UniProtKB/Swiss-Prot annotation:
Compositionally biased tracts (Low complexity): 886-896
Name of the protein in its database record: G patch domain-containing protein 1 homolog
Domain G-patch, residue spans: 153-199
Record-stated family: Belongs to the GPATCH1 family.
Segments of skewed composition (Acidic residues): 214-233
Source species: Drosophila melanogaster
GO BP: any one term: mRNA splicing, via spliceosome
Bias-annotated ranges (Basic and acidic residues): 107-123, 375-402, 414-432, 679-691
Length: 952
């Protein structure tokens, strides 16, 4: 039992043989065995056996015998050379098979197949190979066949190496010094030791290199002398892809002369020339190799002592090989003659078209020459007679051209003018003449004849002398009236764009009359006329204006003159254009020197501060040249473009007139500004008429323009006005109203929120200095008429915003603020002074600073309280609690607003106090709480509906 437990069985066991039963299958004797082909048919027959089957299956050709597959006509290929037939064309597949008389094998003729080791290897390696090895072969040395079958020329790689300076016996690689060569030899010796002890084949040892080591030690310092590397066989570590032991290759199934077998075979191994060849990638010409004569079917072959054992000779299974039988056609094809089969390839037949010959067609032998003295055919004579009939009737003149007719009539031909001699015809050359002269010139071209009546043509009688004199007088009067009229050709009288500058207008007229087109010629022409005082920029601008004005204000005559060209001059212009060589454009190289500045995006990527605090301009913007603007650049463009087009809208006209006010001495406080309604009602006799009238924008347009470029943080008031309830605006005072109360108490003009640009305008109170002082200083003539401007003039409320800050903060510029935000570690250079030297302030600035401090204190006292943060209330809360919270919040807000109203009544005397505001506010707060409760109930109802729908 123990032995059976430890016994391992693999596979399915054969059925056990019974003792009494004899096995049914008996071994077949040799004389009873039958040789069969791949189809399972009997291959060899007797002289009178086999019958139809033997002749059908064993004939040369296809499986069906000599049945033709396709028919190809050789009628059109008679002239072509006939293909030379080969013995393989008359052989069957069995003859070309493995056991046939001419088995096919593939052999390549490649320059890379055999290596010329005798030339490439050194003398050491050759001597090593010549030494006999045990178990290799009976003949020592290099194989004789390998020496006989050497390639005629070297390989491509060897030829390339020789062209690069390589010589046989040297290694491949860069040249080495003595020290490097010694290290390489030591490394190669280690690799050879490993190959000898752990590899399959021992490599030749370089014993001669040991003698060189002593000489190398002498001149170690001489690094200028280099040597070629030693020629050694590199080690290629092939991956192990089998399960054999180390250095065991096993039975190789590859043919002898294949790549895989040649790489693994030893150099002294015998080469079998009768094995199958391997097809290389380049597919060289095939050749048939093999035994010339076969052996009988029932005879054993002689053992080939030179052959190598192959695994294809062994069976790996006990089962018999069942040959694959091909399906045979047993069904007779329809409409096919016996012995033939239907063609499977589609035949493309050209459809022949019948030629319709005429009834009277008579064939003619065109090779037979006719005599010119032979009589003409009747048909041909009849055709010639009909063709010349119209000439005999006098109609042949229509076949003549004008030259032939002039030659027959004997006329003298007028010499045609060449295209160069003919002047360019101007269809508007008579425009400079008067109207009557042109009418007379037209009437003179007509031939005068008599009046045709019933009796015949009556000749025209000459006019009387008095009538002629009267007509001449009328023509003179008409010529006098039309004398001063501007003609179309005289462009100077029609249009004078530079009439303000007579010299410039004169230059323009000369430029128009010159009719120059080349830019270089125009520049030279104007340079001769322009004064010396003109700068280069003015000269270029004047040239550009002249060209543009000549294009725009070109008379109609010139435009039409270019369109109508005489036919004789077209060819001449084409010839001139072809002969004219292309102009060479001069390339002007400009060099600019700019300071490099990294972009803001690059500074963000590297997490560093921008240089100069980001105040330096971009180099692309600096390099952009300023456009040279001229009036004539925009004359052809449209007035309205997509960018500036606005839809027309009608608004009521409202013109606000600024009223100058007299200001008292500086120590006295400025008077409070009157309301706008009172200012408009009071008539002002000293008012000057307003020079510019404009239609102001509507409040909606102003709000949109102001909020267009603002950030979202500054649009809070706009969002509040849209989304908040109107009750809050009525209950609570806005910040603008509180600001207005403070401004009225101090006598300042009522202002509202504006942009930072308007705020900077108020801050910049210093007078203009330097070269710009004359530009911004008030004129002397108008100074007497206009009163002195007030320090706080009336400014429109929608354009200003006052932020109450200390003067120190307002006097800082943008650069100081940017530099203050930068950490001190990021700043490169000496440390900046902490506190700049203070100068004694002027009395006016000191007074203004005191006013600012006073305003700051009042603003802190009367500043609006911060709005409480709103809490998020869930929809499931009880509506009663919401009502109570809303009422309490409204009561608190109403109490706050009532306190603000009391303060407001104390500060502003002209304003009237509001009575009963608290009662109204309480009613509104109750209504508001009811609305909120209704909204919460509706939202709950909608949420329930959504849940039901999601469940369904």
């Amino acid at each position: 039992m123990d032995e059976e437990e430890h016994l391992h069985r693999f596979g399915t066991p054969l059925p056990a043989l019974q003792k009494d039963v004899v096995p049914a299958k008996k071994p077949v004797a040799i004389e009873d065995q039958i040789v069969k082909d791949e189809n399972g048919k009997r291959r060899f027959h007797g002289a009178f056996t086999g019958g139809f089957s033997a002749g059908f299956w064993n004939t040369v050709g296809s499986l069906e015998g000599w049945t033709p597959q396709t028919f190809k006509s050789s009628r059109g290929e008679r002239a072509s050379s006939k293909a030379q037939l080969k013995p393989e064309d008359f052989m069957d597949q069995e003859d070309l098979g493995e056991f046939g008389i001419a088995p096919q094998g593939i052999r390549t003729r490649d320059e890379f197949a055999n290596e010329d080791e005798q030339k490439q290897r050194s003398d050491q390696r050759r001597r090593k190979l010549m030494q006999p090895e045990l178990g290799v072969g009976a003949i020592p040395g290099l194989p004789v066949l390998e020496q006989l079958l050497r390639p005629v020329r070297d390989k491509v790689a060897v030829r390339i190496l020789k062209s690069m300076g390589w010589k046989p016996g040297q290694g491949v690689g860069p040249r080495q010094t003595r020290k490097e060569k010694r290290q390489a030899t030591a490394r190669n010796s280690k690799e050879q030791y490993l190959m000898e002890h752990y590899g399959a084949e021992g490599l030749p040892s370089n014993k001669e290199n040991k003698g060189e080591e002593d000489s190398n030690n002498e001149d170690e310092d001489d690094e200028d002398i280099t040597f070629a590397p030693d020629d050694y066989e590199p080690i290629f570590y092939t991956p192990k892809e089998n399960r054999f032991g180390m250095s065991y290759s096993g039975l190789n199934r590859d043919p002898i002369l294949s790549k895989s077998s040649s790489s693994s075979a030893k150099p002294m191994q015998h080469i079998n020339l009768f094995g199958e060849m391997e097809a290389q990638a380049n597919k060289k010409q095939l050749s048939i190799r093999g035994q010339a004569f076969g052996v009988g079917a029932f005879e054993e072959e002689d053992e080939d002592i030179y052959a190598r054992d192959d695994m294809t000779r062994y069976d790996f299974s006990l089962a018999d090989k069942k040959p694959k039988q091909k399906k045979q056609q047993h069904v007779q094809q329809r409409h096919v003659i016996d012995g033939f089969s239907e063609d499977n390839s589609p035949a493309v037949l050209q459809r022949p078209y019948a030629i319709d010959l005429p009834r009277d067609f008579q064939p003619r032998n065109w090779l037979q020459r006719r005599s010119r003295f032979a009589p003409m055919d009747k048909e041909r004579a009849q055709k010639l007679e009909t063709a010349s009939e119209y000439k005999r009737s006098g109609l042949g003149r229509h076949d003549l051209n004008p030259d032939q007719r002039a030659q027959i009539l004997g006329e003298q031909q007028q010499e045609e003018k060449t295209a160069e001699e003919q002047p360019k015809r101007n269809p508007f050359k008579d425009h400079s003449k008067s109207l009557m002269e042109r009418i007379n010139a037209r009437t003179e071209g007509f031939t005068k004849g008599g009046v045709i009546t019933e009796n015949g043509e009556e000749q025209q009688t000459e006019l009387a002398k008095e009538v002629k004199e009267a007509n001449a007088a009328i023509q003179e009067r008409a010529a006098l009236k039309t004398k001063d009229l501007p003609s179309a050709m005289n462009s100077s009288s029609a249009f004078k764009p530079f009439i303000a500058d007579e010299a410039k207008q004169l230059r323009y007229e000369k430029f128009v009359s010159s009719k120059l087109t080349d830019d270089k010629e125009i520049t030279e022409f104007l340079a001769r006329m322009q004064p010396v005082t003109l700068s280069l920029w003015d000269r270029e601008m004047e040239k550009k204006e002249f060209i543009q004005a000549a294009k725009i204000y070109r008379p109609l005559v010139g435009l039409m003159n270019d369109r109508f060209v005489s036919e004789a001059n077209v060819q001449a212009e084409k010839v001139e254009q072809q002969e004219k060589p292309p102009e060479e454009r001069k390339i002007v190289m400009e060099r600019t020197k700019t300071m490099w500045k990294p972009t803001a995006l690059l500074c963000k990527r590297y997490n560093i501060a921008e240089p100069f605090g980001g105040a330096m301009l971009e180099p692309e913007k600096e390099l952009k040249a300023k456009a040279k603007i001229s009036v004539f650049d925009y004359l052809e463009t449209s007035v309205n473009t997509k960018a500036n087009f606005e839809t027309p809208s009608i608004f009521p006209k409202h013109i606000e007139k600024s009223i100058p006010e007299k200001v008292e001495t500086p120590p006295s406080p400025p008077p409070a500004p009157q309301p706008e309604a009172e200012i408009q009602d009071k008539p002002n006799t000293k008012e000057e008429p307003s020079k510019h009238t404009f239609v102001p924008k509507t409040p909606l347009e102003q709000a949109v323009d102001e909020s267009r470029n603002k950030p979202i943080s500054e649009k809070v008031d706009l969002f509040k006005s849209i989304f908040e309830d109107s009750d809050e605006e009525e209950t609570e005072l806005s910040e603008q109203d509180k600001l207005a109360i403070l401004q009225e108490s101090f006598g300042l003009p009522v202002t509202s929120t504006t942009s930072a640009a308007a705020q900077n305008v108020l801050r910049n109170t210093s007078p203009p200095r330097g070269i710009f002082a004359s530009l911004f200083s008030p004129k002397i003539k108008d100074a007497a008429k206009e009163p002195a401007p007030t320090k706080f003039g009336p400014i429109e409320g929608s354009k200003l915003k006052i932020a109450y800050k200390p003067r120190k903060e307002r006097l800082r510029n943008d650069r100081e603020l940017a530099m203050a935000e930068v950490a001190p570690e990021d700043i490169y250079g000496p440390k900046l002074p902490t506190a700049p030297p203070q100068k004694p302030a002027a009395p006016e600035i000191q007074a203004e600073a005191n006013i600012d401090d006073r305003l700051q204190q009042l603003w802190q006292q009367h500043a609006p309280k911060k709005r409480k943060a709103e809490k998020w209330v869930e929809k499931k809360c009880i509506s009663g609690s919401e009502d109570s919270d809303a009422s309490s919040s409204n009561e608190s807000s109403s109490s706050d607003s009532s306190d603000d109203n009391d303060k407001r009544s104390k500060l502003s005397k002209p304003k009237k106090s509001h009575k009963g505001s608290s009662s109204k506010k309480s009613k509104k707060s109750k209504l508001k709480s009811k609305k909120k409760s209704k909204k919460s109930e509706e939202s709950k109802h909608k949420a329930k509906k959504k849940k039901k729908k999601s469940k369904h």
